[in-house]
Regions:
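Acetyl-CoA-dependent GNAT
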Residues: 1-44, 52-57, 61, 95-98, ...
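Short coil/turn segments at alpha/beta junctions that flank glycine-rich nucleotide-binding fingerprints
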Residues: 48, 65-68
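Active-site acidic-Proline motif in GNAT/NAT acetyltransferases
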Residues: 42-44, 48, 76-77
Length: 114
């Protein structure tokens, strides 16, 4: 998909990645910005600031692309991830519910003007 971008961090081998898309509308409020779909670190690679570096690299790319917002959804069941994103300057906007045939999950929508 040409609208999705990937960033792979290496030090010297792969330590993690981010998947993000520009010009994505935050549901219900009309703001448009870069949606950070995923930020993932390999097992054993947390605690070395790799996540911060990957996050800030995505933020820099979004600014360079002319975006005004960086936003994401994080599972309510993952408070450590929410704390990480809040340390990066993200703020809680609202909650939404994800429904599938087999589950229902609360998602926190976090955003940051950039």
């Amino acid at each position: 998909d040409a609208t999705q971008h990937w960033l792979i961090a290496e030090a010297p081998s792969p330590v993690g990645f981010a998947k993000y898309s520009y010009q994505q509308r935050m549901a219900d409020d009309g703001k448009i910005g870069t949606l950070l779909h995923k930020l993932y670190l390999m097992p054993g690679k947390t605690g070395h600031r790799y996540g911060e570096h990957i996050f800030h690299a995505v933020e820099t790319r979004a600014k360079t692309a002319g975006e005004s917002w960086l936003w994401l959804e994080v599972l309510a069941a993952n408070p450590a991830a929410r704390r990480f994103y809040e340390r990066q300057g993200m703020q809680h906007i609202r909650d939404t519910t994800f429904h599938s045939a087999s589950q229902q999950s609360t998602l926190h929508i976090l955003a940051k003007p950039i």
